[in-house]
């Protein structure tokens, strides 16, 4: 590899990874509540270990949901259905400890919340402040069709394929836990040119040989997913490199909601504000503003205004308008970043209630995002992945640049 070339690595995990089990449980509970009470306030945290699920947090709602049933259904759907996995949907204990949202926090967010989003006036949108301070990033680049960095895109596809071959009995000896990692080589112009390294760790039945696992994963998981032109004789494969992965899931490691924030976003390729997504209703800007920032960045790149774009939004608790909007195109912008910020302000309502209205976020759409990434998804329809504002942004930005 020449000195000007570089390597970049991102990882993903399967839905059976302990931390991802927690994310899916938290978002399944959120979806069940939003389905009956779209204005509910939810901050739901989950912890799992051998034979135990603990659900805690702050939930303020007018409805009732059966949390233990939702937990068991989610665990069963993931595939933990046998006691010998060390974690089983039917026999695990489920403990809950739920409080209401602090009135001190609610005070800054509550006003006008009873209004339906479709009928909210600008004054009502202005009255709903951010649920917390914080900074959020959104990113897009033209490395893949879905405008995501290639390392995380391929890592997610491999992780999804691992679950698919398990659930469809193509590789029936696989168990739910698993991880993937992809290293991409970039040329001197920053373009991805080849896959340098692939790492796959897949939980399995104890009687299967490592030779069979390695052969099967290469043929049934890697080859169907990774474009052949990116693989060459120098690509390195590490498949279950410890030699054995029988004990996994919550029996192997305890899990917590919100511990896979880099897997959830851009695989480390872009910056992260630190806030997790799962279990949080859309008044939490940790989630909704990160989605809005991706929406902005993706439309800028889709418009051809930059090859790569990172958007930062920042908020103060109880204040509706973002305290700052920052855009970095890493030298790839076709117009200045000041112009981009101006057209973004003109075309995106980045107040919390404005984001909720713009992206229609008071719906039960979150559990499907809780594994395999919140961004760049081609298998599900997510509002922040639309590029419906690209043409308008391009027209306005080029008009400003000509002035």
Curated annotation (Swiss-Prot):
L-methionine binds at residues 58, 101, 253, 284. One of its GO terms (molecular function) is magnesium ion binding. It catalyses: L-methionine + ATP + H2O = S-adenosyl-L-methionine + phosphate + diphosphate. GO terms for cellular component: cytoplasm. Coiled coil: none annotated. It comes from the Bacteria. Its EC number is 2.5.1.6. Mg(2+) binds at residue 19. ATP binds at residues 17, 177-179, 244-245, 253, 259-260, 276, 280. Pathway: Amino-acid biosynthesis; S-adenosyl-L-methionine biosynthesis; S-adenosyl-L-methionine from L-methionine: step 1/1. Pfam families: S-AdoMet_synt_C, S-AdoMet_synt_M, S-AdoMet_synt_N. K(+) binds at residue 45. Its cofactor is Mg(2+); K(+). Its main location: cytoplasm. HAMAP family: S_AdoMet_synth1 (MF_00086). Catalyzes the formation of S-adenosylmethionine (AdoMet) from methionine and ATP. The overall synthetic reaction is composed of two sequential steps, AdoMet formation and the subsequent tripolyphosphate hydrolysis which occurs prior to release of AdoMet from the enzyme. PANTHER family: S-ADENOSYLMETHIONINE SYNTHETASE. Belongs to the AdoMet synthase family. Homotetramer; dimer of dimers. This is S-adenosylmethionine synthase. It comes from Geobacillus kaustophilus (strain HTA426). The gene is metK.
């Amino acid at each position: 590899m020449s000195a000007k070339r570089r390597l970049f690595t991102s990882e993903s995990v399967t839905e059976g990874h302990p931390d991802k089990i927690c994310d899916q449980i938290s978002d399944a509970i959120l979806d069940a509540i939003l389905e009956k009470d779209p204005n509910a306030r939810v901050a739901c945290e989950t912890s799992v270990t051998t034979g135990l699920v603990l659900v805690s947090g702050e939930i303020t709602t007018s409805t009732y949901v059966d949390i233990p049933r939702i937990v068991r259904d989610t665990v069963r759907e993931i595939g933990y259905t046998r006691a010998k996995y060390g974690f089983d949907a039917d026999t695990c204990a489920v403990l809950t400890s739920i409080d209401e949202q602090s009135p001190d926090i609610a005070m800054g967010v509550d006003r006008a919340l009873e209004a339906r989003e479709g009928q909210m006036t600008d004054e009502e949108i202005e009255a709903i402040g951010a649920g917390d301070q914080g900074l959020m990033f959104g990113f897009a680049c033209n490395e893949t069709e879905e405008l995501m960095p290639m390392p995380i895109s391929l890592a997610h596809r491999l992780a999804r394929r691992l679950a698919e071959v398990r659930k469809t009995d193509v590789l029936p000896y696989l168990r739910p836990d698993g991880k993937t990692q992809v290293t991409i080589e970039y040329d001197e112009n920053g373009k991805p040119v080849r896959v340098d390294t692939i790492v796959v760790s897949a939980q399995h039945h104890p009687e299967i040989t490592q030779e069979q696992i390695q052969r099967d994963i290469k043929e049934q998981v890697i080859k169907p997913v990774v474009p052949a032109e990116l693989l060459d004789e120098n690509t390195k494969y590490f498949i279950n490199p410890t030699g054995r992965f029988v004990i996994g899931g919550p029996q192997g490691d305890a899990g917590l909601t919100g511990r896979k924030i880099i897997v959830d976003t851009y695989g480390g390729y872009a910056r992260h504000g630190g806030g997790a997504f799962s279990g949080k209703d859309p008044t939490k800007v940790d989630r909704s503003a990160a989605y809005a920032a991706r929406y902005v960045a993706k439309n800028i790149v889709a418009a051809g205004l930059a090859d790569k774009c990172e958007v930062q939004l920042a908020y103060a608790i109880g204040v509706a308008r973002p305290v700052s909007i920052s855009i970095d195109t890493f030298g790839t912008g076709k117009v200045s970043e000041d112009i981009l910020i101006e057209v973004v302000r003109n075309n995106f309502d980045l107040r919390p209630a404005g984001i909720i209205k713009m992206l229609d976020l008071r719906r039960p759409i979150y559990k499907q995002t809780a594994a395999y990434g919140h961004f760049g998804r081609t298998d599900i329809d997510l509002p922040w992945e639309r590029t419906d504002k690209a043409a308008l942004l391009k027209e306005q930005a080029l008009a400003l640049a000509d002035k």
